[in-house]
Amino acid sequence: MALTGSWKLALEEGGKSPKTIVSYLASVKALADFLARNRLPDDTELVGAQAIRAFLVAEIERTSAVSAQVHYRNLRVYFGWLAREGEREAANPMQLVDKPSAPPKVKPFLADDDLGKLMKACSGTSFEDRRDTALLRILIDTGVRVSGLAGLRYHSSDDSLTDVFLSQRRLRVRLKGGRETWVPVGAKSAAAIDRYIRARARIPRAADSPWLWLGTRGRGVDHMTDSGIRAMLKRRGNEAGVQGVHPHRFRHTFADNWLAQGGSVDDLMHIAGWTTYDMPLLYAKGRGIARAHEAHQRLSPGDRI
């Protein structure tokens, strides 16, 4: 497949995240490999809908329908770019390809008991305990993406260099594509962040780092990235006896808890950083029936008569 280098430059110009760009390019490479294995034309002008359908079917059999859906979405972007750039005179083949269907997958939520066990696992007073408690509190309280959480900055006196505003009980979080949003936090989360910041101040050279979350390595400090947060959650999950603890489970759990407590979809969209109603509807599916039954028990019209 041609022009992937040019497409990569266009994606970078459009502000796509490195992770998204890797996914896009991987889909084009997977299609190119499929075409080569099956001795099909791989010229961008000659690739047709039938070949792409065959590729997606093969991906469903080899991996999963969800993986095929990712390739479908990414290839729509690629062939759309080719058309806009005038690099393909033939019609966009993706207009004739249907999105692969996948059975709805119920996302596992973290029960309140599991969240309590995780909090207990880091209830000590060490630097790591203070840090991990604050991280857990924010994840439970906001469902923030791990990339936005890891990217929080901190400065004790310069508002332009910090994303932490505890007096206002809110955080400035960077979203996909470079957008920013203000995420509110509750009193317990704010107190946990404050305890961590005080512990952070006692770490040598902590003031030299622009990042809120620090890891300690020997006598130095380093930025705790999203992979570090993932590793911490796995470790704390093992300590607490809670399996499968990862950032996205907190996001699903937060959305479910928000809606179960009567929170509005519009407010959920703002806090989660979503711009369309598709995402809250997707996240709401998992326990939608259970929430509806719980709401009916609270609001039953018949019980008022």
Model segments located where?
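Conserved catalytic core of the tyrosine transesterase superfamily
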Residues: 1-305
